[in-house]
């Protein structure tokens, strides 16, 4: 019965977007509206796979025989989950700012050199090189990618983003640490490592996954109604998935 309930909407859609969980489900439609490509308005079905159970859905699209696969495009959004030790207490915000940011540098290197979750290669292999399937993965997690996408070389431009404003409201004490880090840099644009450090510190200011997704979603909807000037950048892999389904 579950399979029938899930499959039925797919059959009447123009395309399908598969995401890991309810947090992404809340956000992707709002993200698509920010770039004027509403998934719902374009009849794209958003499917919450309840974790990372993508394989059963890939099988609906991966046959080399066109008569044995669904005809619409399918995009899959997933995290690469490098360096799972980042969840440990030694990498919380207070620890990251100690000893001249020693743990922050370790966290950055751990993520940059960490092994990509094997799920990504498995999904790529299972897609069977079918042009109707696109696997879109982002380094670490969605929450980190959101922060990274909204940090720029110019410090003032970073502070003017909607994301910076939101996290400032949610966690002012944490964002004081972000401000302090940036104020300690020279009066110049930030390099790549420094931008990533700021993104990591912002990421560590966030509340739990579900709370952040719900709060960000409401905040973006309100901001988009108030202002025509979008001050929020989508993570690249999310935008790639949307653009694939809605060229």
What residue ranges belong to the model's regions?
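Acidic, divalent-metal-binding catalytic cores of TOPRIM
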Residues: 1-247
């Amino acid at each position: 019965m579950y399979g029938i309930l899930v499959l039925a909407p797919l059959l009447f859609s123009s395309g399908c977007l598969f995401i890991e969980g309810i947090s992404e489900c809340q956000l992707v439609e709002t993200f698509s509206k920010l770039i004027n490509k509403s998934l719902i308005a374009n009849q794209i079905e958003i499917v919450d796979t309840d974790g990372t159970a993508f394989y059963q859905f890939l099988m609906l699209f991966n046959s080399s025989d066109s008569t044995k696969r669904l005809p619409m495009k399918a995009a899959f959004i997933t995290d690469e989950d490098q360096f799972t030790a980042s969840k440990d207490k030694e990498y919380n915000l207070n620890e990251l700012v100690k000893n001249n940011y020693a743990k922050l540098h370790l966290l950055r290197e751990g993520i940059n050199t960490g092994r990509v979750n094997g799920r990504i290669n498995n999904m790529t292999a299972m897609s069977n090189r079918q042009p109707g399937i696109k696997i879109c993965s982002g380094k670490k997690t969605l929450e980190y990618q959101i922060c990274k996408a909204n940090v720029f070389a110019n410090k003032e431009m970073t502070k003017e983003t909607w994301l910076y404003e939101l996290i400032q409201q949610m966690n002012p004490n944490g964002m004081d640490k972000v401000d302090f880090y940036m104020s300690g840099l020279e009066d110049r644009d930030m390099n790549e490592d420094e931008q990533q450090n700021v993104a990591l510190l912002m990421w560590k200011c966030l509340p739990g996954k579900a709370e952040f997704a719900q709060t960000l979603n409401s905040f973006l909807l309100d901001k988009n109604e108030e202002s025509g000037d979008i001050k929020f950048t989508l993570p690249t892999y999310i935008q790639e998935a949307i653009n694939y389904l809605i060229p």
